[in-house]
A protein has these predicted regions:
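N-terminal signal peptide c-region/cleavage motif recognized by signal peptidases
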Residues: 16-20
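Short intrinsically disordered, low-complexity segments
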Residues: 13-15, 125
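Cleavable N-terminal signal peptides
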Residues: 9-11, 21
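Sequence context surrounding c-type heme c attachment/ligation sites in exported
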Residues: 25, 29-61, 67-151
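Bacterial N-terminal signal peptides that target proteins for export
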Residues: 1-9
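Long, acidic, intrinsically disordered low-complexity segments
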Residues: 2-3, 22-24
Length: 151
């Protein structure tokens, strides 16, 4: 009877651990999906602004201000998706993010500051100012991508 009880208890513990591990894997998958969705949404609006800056779309200050506000808002979202363990899985994030977390956070903050500048420039209606601000935002994106994204 003791052997059956021990075996049953051991089996229960294994099943519980398997369930916990599965829940942790789901949490990691959700974190990766969260940050990918935020980056995809941000890229959609950034690309429209870049097309405008590069002369492929006419400059519409009202539309660009709307797009810039969207990017500014969304630029705050992806960072909570970089949870421990999410370096594994379907991701282009380099492991360095978790080893150089302070630098990664500085780059995230820099991006957020630059997106605010783009919003301000777009709302001003000044194309020259808008182009300069978008250029600085692109530089912030590229700096972080070079350091922390697998291509």
């Amino acid at each position: 009877m003791n052997t059956k009880f021990i075996l049953l208890a051991f089996t229960g513990i294994l099943l519980l651990q398997t369930g916990i591990a599965h829940a942790q894997d789901r949490k990691i998958e959700q974190a990766i999906k969260h940050r990918k969705a935020a980056f995809t949404l941000m890229a959609t609006y950034v690309n429209r602004m870049v097309q405008t800056v590069d002369g492929h779309r006419p400059f519409d200050a009202k539309l660009m201000a709307q797009d810039a506000r969207t990017v500014e808002l969304v630029s705050k979202l992806p960072w909570e998706g970089f949870v421990e363990g999410s370096e594994r899985g379907d991701t282009r994030a380099k492991d360095d993010i978790w080893f150089e977390e302070d630098q990664f956070k500085r780059y995230a903050n820099e991006l957020q500051a630059k997106t605010a500048m783009v919003t301000f420039a777009a709302e001003s209606g000044d194309l020259k100012r808008f182009k300069a601000a978008v250029g600085q935002m692109r530089d912030a994106c590229n700096t972080c991508h070079k350091a922390f994204r697998k291509d």
